[in-house]
Amino acid sequence: MLMPKRVKYRKQHRGRMKGNAKGGALVNFGEYGLKAMESHWITAQQIEACRIAITRTLKKTGKLWIRVFPDKSYTKHPAESKLGKGKGNVEGWVAVVKPGKILFEIGGVDEKLAREALEYAATKLPIRTKIVKRHEIGGEAV
């Protein structure tokens, strides 16, 4: 699973997810991308499930770029524990995703196969997504 090697503070505040993505909203590496349309936490397990789904669809052709990383820990108390007694133990790692963020990119394959792979990966995520294509105007990527 994806997780940071080390962090300064293990336990974080939950935070708020308001507004759109600040960066990472353009397809920079591949030709096709999967763009988030809603705010949500994406877990390391969901990212891994998408990675497996895409690589199985692409087989040995093309290249995959994962543009999100789970760098935020979330905590949970054990079942049937009483309230209080401090913050729970770290349960897992999530990536905070806002609308407009590119989650995955694919390059080196035709459009039909790229769409098939990204549509299959989108079923593994808890958010609405959209498949976007790299925009090129006058030979330059925008």
From Swiss-Prot:
Q: Which domain of life is it from?
A: Bacteria
> Which Gene Ontology terms cover its molecular function?
rRNA binding; structural constituent of ribosome; tRNA binding
GO-annotated cellular components:
cytosolic large ribosomal subunit
Q: Where is the signal peptide?
A: none
Q: Which UniProt keywords apply?
A: Ribonucleoprotein, Ribosomal protein, RNA-binding, rRNA-binding, tRNA-binding
What InterPro entries is this protein classified in? Ribosomal_uL16, Ribosomal_uL16_bact-type, Ribosomal_uL16_CS, Ribosomal_uL16_dom, Ribosomal_uL16_sf
SUPFAM superfamilies xref list? Ribosomal protein L16p/L10e
Q: Which GO terms describe its biological process?
A: translation
Which NCBIfam families does the annotation name?
rplP_bact
Q: Which family does it belong to?
A: Belongs to the universal ribosomal protein uL16 family.
Q: What does this protein do?
A: Binds 23S rRNA and is also seen to make contacts with the A and possibly P site tRNAs.
* Record note on quaternary structure: Part of the 50S ribosomal subunit.
Identify this protein by name. Large ribosomal subunit protein uL16
Species source reads Thermosipho africanus (strain TCF52B)
